[in-house]
Each structure stands twice: as structure tokens, then as C-alpha cells.
Amino acid sequence: MKFLLGTLVVLATFVTLCNSQCYFIPNQSLKPNECQDLKGVSHPLNSVWKTKDCEECTCGQNAISCCNTAAIPTGYDTNKCQKILNKKTCTYTVVEKKDPGKTCDVTGWVL
């Protein structure tokens, strides 16, 4: 019972910290069983795919929904540091602007 309670507390904390960045594209495809993304690529209805920009998209009846899958760093010195997205691993690193070989402290991440 304690294990179950502990698991629920961790899950609730994780859900509270999540703040996905999503957007919707109205489905303007002339075909009823597919969606067309902004690049003109057709996707079957109810399909899910990942983009090269670290987004996961879903083709729905009325729209395509896309959400960011890379955790975005927050709580770092934006004057001194910059975030860099590695599109191969869908992860950010935060480095000094003047010396990109040095990493910066990050106090939070938002998904």
C-alpha cells in the first residue's frame, strides 16, 4: 500500500510539472481519411509521427495536433547563457555565450 501511495505521489508531481507546448493545425485535406501537414505531406487519420524538430504529431478528424517532446531549460542566466537544441537526441544543453565549452547551471525544465 505504501508503494502504491508513493507511486501516485511521484506521478502526481510529474504531471504537475509537465507543461507541454502544443499547437493545432486545422485539417484542410480534401480526403476524409487523412491529414495534410504544413509541408504538404499526407498522414493517415489517427496516425502519430515525430518531426525533425522534436515534435510528436497526431492526425485527428478535425486537426493535426503537435506537441514538443524536448524538455526546455528554465531558470538559468539568459544574459550569460544560451540554450542549444540537439535535434538528433531532442535534448537541450545550456552553455555560456562567450565560451560555449562551459555549461551553465539550470534550475528547472519544462516539457
Curated annotation (Swiss-Prot):
By its UniProt entry, which Gene3D superfamilies does this protein fall under? 2.20.25.590, Complement Module, domain 1
Give the main localization category: secreted
Q: How does it assemble?
A: Homodimer; Interacts with PI16.
Q: In which tissues is it expressed?
A: Corpora lutea, mostly in the luteal cells surrounding blood vessels.
Per UniProt, the keywords (alphabetical) are: Disulfide bond, Pyrrolidone carboxylic acid, Secreted, Signal
Any S-S bridges, and between which cysteines? 22-67, 35-59, 54-90, 57-66, 81-104
What residues bear Pyrrolidone carboxylic acid in this entry? 21
What name does the UniProt record give this protein?
Beta-microseminoprotein
Q: Name one GO cellular component term.
A: extracellular region
Query: What species is given as this protein's source?
Result: Sus scrofa
Pfam families according to UniProt = PSP94
Stretch forming the signal peptide: 1-20
Q: Which family does it belong to?
A: Belongs to the beta-microseminoprotein family.
User: What's the domain of life for this entry?
Assistant: Eukaryota
Q: Name its cellular compartments.
A: Secreted
